[in-house]
Amino acid sequence: MAAEKGGSSDEERKPLTRGSMEYRDSSNSLHYSSSAASLSLAVIDRINGSTHDTGPDEIGRGDRDYSDDGEYDLEEADYIPSGGKPVQKKVKIVLGFLLFLCLSGWSLAFVLFLFGGHESSKTSIVYEDNISDTGSQGIKITLDEVFDGTWSPNSRDISWIPGPNGEDGLLLEKGASISNGYLRVEDIVSRKDPKSSKKPIVLMQKAYFNVSGEAVFPSRVWPSPDLKTVLVLSNEEKNWRHSFTGKYWLFDVESQTGQPLDPAAKDQRVQLASWSPRSDAVVFTRDNNMFLRKLSSNEVIKITTNGGVNLFYGVPDWVYEEEVFSGNSVTWWADDGEYIAFLRTNESSVPEYPVQYFVSRPNGEIPKPGGESYPETRKIKYPKAGAPNPIVDLQFFDVGKDEVFSVDIKGDFADSNRLIIEVVWASNGKVIVRSTNRESDVLHVAVIDVLSRTGKIVRKEDINALDGGWVEPSQTTRFIPADPDNGRLNDGYIDTVIYEGRDQLAYYTPIDNPKPIVLTNGHSEVVQAPSGVDLKRGLVYFVVAGNEPWERHIYSVNFDGTSLQPVTNVSESSYYDVSFSNGAGYAFLKYAGPQVPWQKVISTPANEVTFEETIEENNHLSERLRQYTLESKIYQYIDIDGFSLPVLERRPPNFNQTKKYPVLFYLYGGPGSQTVKKKFNVDFQSYVAANLGYIVVTVDGRGTGFIGRKARCIIRGNLGHFESLDQIQAAKIWAAKPYVDESRISIWGWSYGGFMALKTIEQDGGRTFKYGIAVAPVTDWRYYDSIYTERYMHTPQRNPGGYDNAAISNTTALANNIRFLVMHGTADDNVHIQNSLTFIDKLDVNNVHNYDVHFFPDSDHSIYFHNAHKIVYSRLADWLVNAFNGEWLKTYDPTPNDSILRRAATWVGMSI
């Protein structure tokens, strides 16, 4: 249930800005303006009766502020009809001149608003996106099309790779034709210039190679930094969400031949392998022990020897993989290749949880005779809330001395009260280590010197005392080396900090300075930042949740916090992502919505070379949108207890204000999460609105991300309380709308969303929500993992009342709903089936029977085994249709019908 995280390369970055108040836009079709200016333009164009052609170069322009049904909707405000009388020519000229003046002023004001600490009520602001304009003539999307890739945007993964001699703008391409090479490195600019002297470097000519008669087919590849050898993974098998095992090989580029990573154990499965920055060695973990293979020898060096069932070296256990690092590695090379840092994880005291498989046998072993009828059981070391955690400590390996050592840090947390959440190598043998206490509300930043083998805490932050919140694990801290020629006298680092109630960027220098230079501030919050750094020019760039939390835009700022510049076109309400080449001369810009996604590689403004190449336009989706009828999306805010909460309302095609529509609320709602996003997405909710004809509403309530820490942290210690009240209040707002049938309102969610669906209908007691659907729900936070749960709830020993309140336990209230549905995979290693089974037991004990249940044998949290994923959504859709058709009312208080019984009896020749 870990929130989605993303990291960024530690390589040097450059900005994407060209000068004051500029953004990079290939079409040059829009000038920089605030959203308020765009709103005015939309209104003026509507008065004039004009329309916008939102082609690829004008994505999302102009049509976000009014709806296609002629309603300029400010909640229940009057609307301006699209067929109004045209404005006279003189009025147009005056309005145009006034608009020009306003745009000029707003251009300067926008950045000041965005990062100037301005806070305003957004309750009545409404934005609409309608990407399909076929009306009633279009084709309806089907449920199969939602999941078979019909509506999935094509997306190219650009893998930037550093050049062995400092070259910038190099791409690693896999899967090219045999004539061009299966794996190759190519200069992004020269590949479009046939006269260029920069030729591609072919690393692997073919898509496979042979080693001693064994054909090796790569599933993942990692070129060495000098591009002379490729580390290859084959025979990959999934472990948990992020981890996998396989056979590893070393492929020599010059000879085009391969060899096992460990020639003495070529068939043994390896958990993790990574290159030395010097390209002369590979460190790897096998059977939870670490080894080093130097390319100068066929022998491997044992770094550790006592790894096994309870001791992990270099790889995380289940809970650290899921909740802290969101990855399969806890191994870090120093930049000079002299040292390796790694975590040792001791699970000796962690209780086991058995996951049973009734149909499949994931371990691949054939049971002994007589054992075929018994399920396979996989025991996981899984620390539930309040249970013993794994003990994790940081260790180091001196490559030259072949020695493992650790460094004590005075004043650090006790072993049982420590979570290590990030490790970043600095220069001259120094390491930055971020750790928290068990409940994740006190942060320590330590600096370790591996040369002197000393360490000290350089920064402490009590987040609980600051705002009652917590520390979210992240791996985005960026080391900034000293560079006196460019004004940096000391080493430092950039981190995300809490400033004036928001997540902002800060620069700490020297490296042991506890007081930062705050780089960003104001209304918006940075997202997984920093995204990159231009060391030469002293610039940081980052992604920000823009003027509206559902947007993503890219900005840059100087190391001293001055010259905040937009990179993307902030006058358009858009959702962007970006990655940069290792020298930051080029950027891979990804537009994700609200219109059809596209991808481009562009040169950055600091680059002397001007370059732009469209990588993907998704023309197939543009064509499909001309054929199909999709829902319209209304983005707006509602005010609940003084908080402006983002809402997405999906309306069916040909929406009619005079009709009464059923409403389905869809949510996730986990702490720091976000579901209301302006991304192109045709999903199950689209199917419900566009095919079934229901309204779908999503509310990012209190506790979710990018609406300020005050709204986020209020939920701590009492998960589900404020979040469910927000959903109930929102449902009451929608129930009062003239186009909503208040007797047909339902809610559904998966995982944390499943918990929220149950908690909401429990709190509501059938007064507003009549139906609910929960997939893989947590029903008692005592059953979920410790690191995630205690971050938001403290321990059960410290907060027993909070855990009692958060549990789904009021069966009397649940009995007042018409009906609800629970679905769960029996092999869920994340949210255990224990949650649903104990919940159903409570219902049985209290004689509650207004529910349905569906278990999926051997499916994990994603519910895919044996066609299960399709069945989940088919069942969900059918159940929902039956609910809104009133079928479940017939089961609410069933009574015999004599006429039906008589007809049935005649079919079998009986008499009654």
UniProtKB/Swiss-Prot annotation:
Cytoplasmic side: 1-92
Region Disordered: start-end pairs: 1-30, 48-68
Topological domains annotated Vacuolar: 114-912
Cellular component terms (Gene Ontology): fungal-type vacuole membrane; plasma membrane
PROSITE patterns in the cross-refs: PRO_ENDOPEP_SER
Matches recorded under Pfam families: DPPIV_N, Peptidase_S9
Family per record: Belongs to the peptidase S9B family.
Protein name: Probable dipeptidyl-aminopeptidase B
Organism classification: Eukaryota, Fungi, Dikarya, Ascomycota, Pezizomycotina
Gene symbol of the encoding locus: DAPB
